Amino acid sequence: MLHPRARTMLLLSLPAVAIGIASSLILIVVMKIASVLQNLLWQRLPGTLGIAQDSPLWIIGVLTLTGIAVGLVIRFSQGHAGPDPACEPLIGAPVPPSALPGLIVALILGLAGGVSLGPEHPIMTVNIALAVAIGARLLPRVNRMEWTILASAGTIGALFGTPVAAALIFSQTLNGSSEVPLWDRLFAPLMAAAAGALTTGLFFHPHFSLPIAHYGQMEMTDILSGAIVAAIAIAAGMVAVWCLPRLHAMMHQMKNPVLVLGIGGFILGILGVIGGPVSLFKGLDEMQQMVANQAFSTSDYFLLAVIKLAALVVAAASGFRGGRIFPAVFVGVALGLMLHEHVPAVPAAITVSCAILGIVLVVTRDGWLSLFMAAVVVPNTTLLPLLCIVMLPAWLLLAGKPMMMVNRSKQQPPHDNV
């Protein structure tokens, strides 16, 4: 017979698996629709019209129209496409289900139109809202926080294709003073994360790892080099942290989301023209292209890092629906490659992984997630001790510093009466 503790853990196992599968399927459907629309906007349509897809007019035009379209969705959809991601953490409170159709449409338009944001925040919002709404009907005795945790774990597993990230993140958030053992509390979230990851793996495999030269043996000088790289990435990220709330306040003085996002899309188009097509979209596929292109120089990598970081800030400040983690990883890769080109004696594995660690730490303020992203993009077990050591001075640098979010008290009210 099972111990009462085991029976308690099994109570939520079936709902956890169902939520993990559903979280993954929602992500897959949204990404597939966005991919089809992206192909139409950036491949078939310019080909039919006889226009180069990297034409400055096409890039500016598509991103401007994308901003206007997203603005119309936010202005007129019920619930105004959910909360502004610039004012929200990755895992937030559940939103009313009535806001989800507008949020999904706004996300798809942004992903397809080339906006420099990822899908993680809106998908997380959608999955949490659905899990809480449906779970409260089916199992009213389970509280909202349990459904929120299961949905966020399933989404994290689906996004990254592995339950490891969820295990790392929730090991700190669920580790309270309760007498219930940590792994008892992790059981159901890990079931959801595993179900989400396995479901995603049936359809496609998230490809984060880059073909970076293997790193052999750690030396003492490598720790210093890695700490310096992480500090440079943190400094770049903190510039974005300073700019985001100020640009957000300035943009939203115009009140009308169609105007705000139209102007934001136009600015993104100009940045896209300067950075080229590789600086568009969420950044995961584009960082593969960046690494594969042997023609890029130090100045090219620097330009891409600056443009992508600026595009991330503009997109978030304008109110586009999307997440900041994936484009931040692109910025980290570009910074790392730039520093390696500038100082070839420092291995690319160190510069890239430590730059990712630093910039993702700025964006998320989550040490485990930052370590995870650095480790999966540059998969090398020799790097793990170095990354753990480099994390320490990086965490000290960011202690007490503002986060990459707009203060909720300064958030503009919904556009109900605009």
Swiss-Prot record:
One of its GO terms (molecular function) is chloride transmembrane transporter activity. It comes from the Bacteria. Keywords: Cell membrane, Ion channel, Ion transport, Membrane, Transmembrane, Transmembrane helix, Transport. Its main location: membrane. One of its GO terms (cellular component) is plasma membrane. It is found in: Cell membrane. Pfam families: Voltage_CLC. The chain crosses the membrane at residues 10-30, 54-74, 99-119, 120-140, 149-169, 186-206, 223-243, 258-278, 300-320, 322-342, 343-363, 371-391. It is a multi-pass membrane protein. Belongs to the chloride channel (TC 2.A.49) family. This is Putative ion-transport protein YfeO. It comes from Escherichia coli O9:H4 (strain HS).
